[in-house]
């Protein structure tokens, strides 16, 4: 044990050698002592190392082509949306990196403003999955919020600050890490005001929510209640800066295509105008031609649109794309169910016609890729119920008839092993 012998035995720090009279606190361990000054020094070293680790991650930011290539492994189709998202996400985190470096620079930096993303497109086409895959690749906190549950502060429903609480929870309450995360707000089209004219009456779940979202979208120091706010009014607030949080807001925007079609169709009026048939106008990708004026007419306020400068559109998935989604991505549904059956020692096979029939059903139901799993569950339910109780099945083959006519899948029996045949003959 470390001691000083002049004028009586005094305990001293095992690290710096200072006596208990020279420091404020001396903490004892098994045979060692550490003072408060050495503890502070250790904390500073740890914080510096963690900050250096964060800088390394930013330096290793993947390029747009690498981001798009990663998305290709999980999401089928939607090439335009992938390219738009890849560039927007790269620029966003490059902006954060530039902000970190400018703190150490004496020159006056050019301030880079944030570019949040608006995603348009029908349900079941991959909007949410694209955002989830991006967050997975970048290893940043990710939170999903439903805009329909939000209301203005003081009304029944969720405050917009609850969105930030979900992000903080996803970061395990590491606020610094949460401040570079991604928030995905779905169903944003449901908070559009009822008309493009400003409302005289209070619209607490529409225009009111858009107004409430403006500050956090732009970047502000927000006070977030750790337990949800309204039920616990006296709790301490968590402070979070949303300046570097990337917001991706999305919606199906049903009816927007007609607004775009009407505007695009007017180009055919007057001398020298391009004349196009109604069929040509109807068959084009309307969401790719969306302008701010269309979104205002739909019911989004100009200030809200102004904070979403990047627009990415997804299109309806055709039959060929749905078949690819079933079998090609790294975590494709077919691969997932094949693995489930492997756990029971059974091989699972889908014929090409069966996959096409599943895609046809998803198109007929209008559920897109989101409805594929439900159809697969319906098709495989009878055999998934029976297989665990049987040991005579080697293979299950799902055919077109299984999907269309509710016929049971073809079951290939397992050949008995030599020992089983010997036991049976005996």
UniProtKB/Swiss-Prot annotation:
One Gene Ontology cellular component annotation held by this UniProt entry: HslUV protease complex
Chain positions recorded as ATP binding sites: 122-129
Superkingdom per UniProt: Bacteria
Molecular function as annotated in GO: ATP binding; ATP hydrolysis activity; ATP-dependent protein folding chaperone; protein dimerization activity; unfolded protein binding; zinc ion binding
Annotated keywords: ATP-binding, Chaperone, Metal-binding, Nucleotide-binding, Zinc
Sequence positions that bind Zn(2+): 13, 16, 35, 38
Domain annotation ClpX-type ZB: ranges: 1-54
GO biological process per UniProt: cell division; proteolysis involved in protein catabolic process
InterPro entries registered for this protein in UniProt: AAA+_ATPase (IPR003593), ATP-dep_Clp_protease_ClpX (IPR050052), ATPase_AAA_core (IPR003959), Clp_ATPase_C (IPR019489), Clp_protease_ATP-bd_su_ClpX (IPR004487), ClpX_bact (IPR046425), P-loop_NTPase (IPR027417), Znf_CppX_C4 (IPR010603)
Keyword check for Oxidoreductase: no
PROSITE patterns: CLPX_ZB
Function: ATP-dependent specificity component of the Clp protease. It directs the protease to specific substrates. Can perform chaperone functions in the absence of ClpP.
Family, similarity comment: Belongs to the ClpX chaperone family.
Subunit structure as annotated in this protein's UniProt entry: Component of the ClpX-ClpP complex. Forms a hexameric ring that, in the presence of ATP, binds to fourteen ClpP subunits assembled into a disk-like structure with a central cavity, resembling the structure of eukaryotic proteasomes.
The protein's name: ATP-dependent Clp protease ATP-binding subunit ClpX
Species of origin: Mycolicibacterium smegmatis (strain ATCC 700084 / mc(2)155)
Organismal lineage: Bacteria, Bacillati, Actinomycetota, Actinomycetes, Mycobacteriales
């Amino acid at each position: 044990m470390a001691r000083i012998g002049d004028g009586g035995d005094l305990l001293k720090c095992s690290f710096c050698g200072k006596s208990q009279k020279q420091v404020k606190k001396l903490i004892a361990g098994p045979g060692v002592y550490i003072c408060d000054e050495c503890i502070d020094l250790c904390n500073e070293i740890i914080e510096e190392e963690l900050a250096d680790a964060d800088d390394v991650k930013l330096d290793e930011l993947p390029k747009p082509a690498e981001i798009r290539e990663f998305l290709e492994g999980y999401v089928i189709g939607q090439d335009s949306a992938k390219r738009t998202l890849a560039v927007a996400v790269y620029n966003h985190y490059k902006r954060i990196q530039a902000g970190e470096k400018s703190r150490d620079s004496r020159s006056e930096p050019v301030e880079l403003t944030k570019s949040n993303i608006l995603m348009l497109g029908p349900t079941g086409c991959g909007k949410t999955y694209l955002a989830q895959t991006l967050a997975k690749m970048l290893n940043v906190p990710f939170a999903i919020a439903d805009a329909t549950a939000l209301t203005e502060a003081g009304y029944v429903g969720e405050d917009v600050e609850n969105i930030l609480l979900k992000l903080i929870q996803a970061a395990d309450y590491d606020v610094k890490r949460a401040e570079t995360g991604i928030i995905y707000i779905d169903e944003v089209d449901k908070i559009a005001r009822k008309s493009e004219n400003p409302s005289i009456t209070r619209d607490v779940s529409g225009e009111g929510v858009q107004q409430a979202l403006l500050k956090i979208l732009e970047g502000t120091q927000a006070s977030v209640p750790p337990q949800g706010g309204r039920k616990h009014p006296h709790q301490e607030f968590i402070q979070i800066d949303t300046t570097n949080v990337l917001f991706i807001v999305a919606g199906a925007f049903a009816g927007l295509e007609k607004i775009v079609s009407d505007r695009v169709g007017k180009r055919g009026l007057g001398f020298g105008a391009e004349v196009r048939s109604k069929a040509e106008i109807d068959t084009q990708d309307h969401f790719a031609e969306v302008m701010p004026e269309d979104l205002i007419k739909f019911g989004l306020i100009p200030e809200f649109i102004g904070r979403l400068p990047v627009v990415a559109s997804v299109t309806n998935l055709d039959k060929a794309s749905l078949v690819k989604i079933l079998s090609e991505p790294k975590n494709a549904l077919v691969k997932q169910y094949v693995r489930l059956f492997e756990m029971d020692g059974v091989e699972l096979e889908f014929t090409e016609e069966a996959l096409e029939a599943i895609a046809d059903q998803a198109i007929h139901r209008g559920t897109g890729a989101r409805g594929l799993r439900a159809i697969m569950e319906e098709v495989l339910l009878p055999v998934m119920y029976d297989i665990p109780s049987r040991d005579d099945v080697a293979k299950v083959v799902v055919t077109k008839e299984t999907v269309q006519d509710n016929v049971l899948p073809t079951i290939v029996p397992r050949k008995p092993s030599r020992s089983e045949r010997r036991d049976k003959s005996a």
